[in-house]
Amino acid sequence: MKKIFNFIFLLISITVFSQIDNIKSGEKLTYRLHYGFLNAGTATLTTNQITYKGKPHYRVTGVGRSTGAVRAFFKVDDVYESYINIATGLPSYYVRNVSEGGYRRHYETEFNHDNQSLTLTNKLDQTSKNFKTMRGIQDMLSSFYNLRSMDKSKFKVGSNIKMNVWIDDESYPFMLKVVAVENKTTKFGDISCLKIKPYVMSGRIFKSQEGVTMWVTNDENHVPVEIRAELLVGSLKASLDGYANVKYPLNFSK
């Protein structure tokens, strides 16, 4: 289970960069996580508009926690935060504060996109490091909101979307492939979705590079409604469990 919540937020999030214009302040998305047949936990994403260093930003907060029987033997309490420049879609500040069993990390990242660098501070030992990055680098949460603000023309079946996501002290290349348009059944009803295959790192968490499938709404919202991942041990499923203040209507049919 170690780092699984970390990667769930990543899989909900991975994308490229663009102006953030498909999000409304006050939005909330909640996901139910299952590990095999077990009710494993919840993940919640909330968005509020703020001013950061004199510029309009979205402050996105992601909270993940284990529940039920899983929490009895593996306690997870994760908090992620990203301050995203609304005009550029790029992250200015990012926090990853996670506790997963005996695994503990608390990092804060300041991005400087003008000179393609960042400063990573380890809040547990109060040390800082500077890194060179690349143009358009994203964090795990900012990439989520860029995905949803991309033009629908980029989501044609067969298209590939490449990206680089900064995780802790390293940049990871990812690619998304749109493979189909499908109707997906959810607790709210059926909805047209884009079926997407993220190509991920095999051998550490996932069985293969193609071990993950995600479905996002085929509309202006691009809300992920389900993610399935085949792990080295077991499988994981994340399903949309609640939503509020989404900018455009979600057209579920009963």
Descriptions of predicted regions:
Residues 1, 18-19:
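Absolute protein N-terminus
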Residues 2-10:
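Sec-dependent signal peptide recognition
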Residues 13-15:
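N-terminal signal peptide c-region/cleavage motif recognized by signal peptidases
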Residues 19-113, 152-254:
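Acidic, serine/threonine-rich low-complexity disordered tracts
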